Amino acid sequence: MSQSLKFAPPFQSFVDASFFQVFSRLKLDVLRLDSHELPLHAKVDLAGLARGSSISHVFLDSQSFDEATASLPGISLRGSFFNFNTLEEFKRLDKGRFLSEQAQLLWEAGVNGYLDEAAGFFVICFADLKKYRFYYWFATPCFQPETLELKVVKREALTEIDKFSNFIEQNKILCGVLNEETGEVIRASRHELERYSTLVVRDTSNIEHCPTSLVKNFVAVWRHHNPNRSECRVLLLRETCSFSLELSVTGDAMSTSQLKASGWERNVRGLLTPKISELGAIIDPTKLAEQSIDLNLKLMKWRLVPDINLDIVKNCKVLLLGAGTLGCYVARSLLAWGVRKITFVDNGSVSYSNPVRQPLFNFTDCGQPKATSAAAAMKAIFPLVDATGFQLEVPMIGHPLTDEARQKKDYEELRQLIRDHDIVFLLMDSRETRWLPTILGNLESKLVINAALGFDSYLVMRHGNYEQPESSRLGCYFCHDVVAPSDSLTDRTLDEMCTVTRPGVALIAAAYATELAVSVLQHPQGNNAPETSESVLGSVPHQLRGFLPQLSTVKLRTPAYKHCSACSSVIVDAVRENGWEFLREALVDHRIVERLSGLAQVQQETETFLATMEISDDDCFDEIS
């Protein structure tokens, strides 16, 4: 007497955290808003059935997106991955209809290709990458035409399965047909299915007398090619307790038949509902912070700036000369841009007035060196940043030598630091402090960004590339001057010694300085970019001058000045050839620089010209009577 056939679920999924980590990178860097189907390649663990499991596992891990996984030992299973851009879209999906559509695709693959291609799986997923929470649902479509009916005519144990060892050891498929003439199990296309009526299935179930639901798929395809046969034999191979079924197969299994499909996986409570994977709880917090920083930046590439090069920013090594108000705000902005290497140089200590204006310091830092405190604060904000602080004094032109050995050492260390970095920010309080770094930036061909503050105004500029011809080169901070910088710090009142500015000026200038640097990095010509051109982020001006009273900013261009005290060829060459010997003299007497650069001659010519323009009494107009 024939009996109805009961089936076991085909698989239990096991999704490793590495699967979602790979998908996260794929989503951010490649797919972005693209939600097209992705191929998956999984391995079926039948060995686990011998260890007490009732259903075999399908493993998804970091290799599942790699086609090469299919060539690895073990049974391979093809699948598809569908990612949704919003949680609402994931929820709105008609799950029953979607399962039926996927079942139809497997049915057609089995009918038109090989029998084993009627088995497969898919995963639908929404990734909340801000919280590292993944909503997903695994399904293995199992189907049969609505009119198809399967009955068990005979069930018996299989004791001699050694003859199937070649099929088990050498094949990566779940199902084939038995060549009844040779006893060999072969992969089954339409030709073999029309000829043979014994299916051989690697059973993924370990439940007694209860085969995998995939048997329905295989028998339905067999029936399609054998509409006039009503008996089919199925050999179910297991690690233990293999058995055979003789089935009575009735009903229609044509291509136009409506399929009954099932296959959504139940959760641990036995409910038909998606699962949630919370990776945020298991990922190293520092790695999670790194990925979150990258997330915000990579989202720019999705719609807003697809061509932005984030790696060139991330890999840029930045030197901040000055760890005061400007230095702190520039450092925070660079960190937000993903810069990983930031070095501070400052010779001061944190004063009690600093923490309210300089965001890298707090009350407990007062009295500590600024450079090292700023670096420590950056690491506290983001532990993976390579932040270092150097407490050294930048030798200043026009200031007498007080300790030549120490100042020479500071010069050599400063030159090496500039050599080791890609961008140099000049963020100090005085003009003369910026003179030597400007020359060294030219010597080492570095991108130099300069920011300076007034009470209610600011200047942000990029220095021209010294390797360009002087006639077309952009000017530096000192190209406006007709005198060399000198001691501006001595004999100053309290309001002149402190940096007195409107509090918002530093934030604006720091933001412009950072954005200008990043925009230049994005330009194909880098620091050679003409000030009238644009990068993917917009314009790359030479300099910006801002005025808070009018809430205005203007873009200006200043060409390189051939008599400049910092970027003229004679000054740069003098430092290149003579190094500290030249600088020692210039530090003591700034007029040496004026004479060498030609500024002294310009001053003399100007005075002579003005003298000839003096109007004598005889040149006055007659009074009108």
From Swiss-Prot:
UniProt keyword Transport present: yes
InterPro entries: Atg7, Atg7_N, Atg7_N_1, Atg7_N_2, ThiF/MoeB/HesA, ThiF_NAD_FAD-bd, Ubiquitin-activating_enz
Record flagged with keyword Cytoplasm: yes
GO MF annotation terms: Atg12 activating enzyme activity; Atg8 activating enzyme activity; identical protein binding
Keywords: Autophagy, Cytoplasm, Protein transport, Transport, Ubl conjugation pathway
Family recorded in the similarity comment: Belongs to the ATG7 family.
Record text on subunit structure and interactions: Homodimer.
Domain notes: The GxGxxG motif is important for the function, possibly through binding with ATP.
UniProt-listed PANTHER family: UBIQUITIN-ACTIVATING ENZYME E1 (PTHR10953), UBIQUITIN-LIKE MODIFIER-ACTIVATING ENZYME ATG7 (PTHR10953:SF3)
Protein name, per record: Ubiquitin-like modifier-activating enzyme ATG7
Organism: Eremothecium gossypii (strain ATCC 10895 / CBS 109.51 / FGSC 9923 / NRRL Y-1056) (Yeast)
Gene name of the record: ATG7
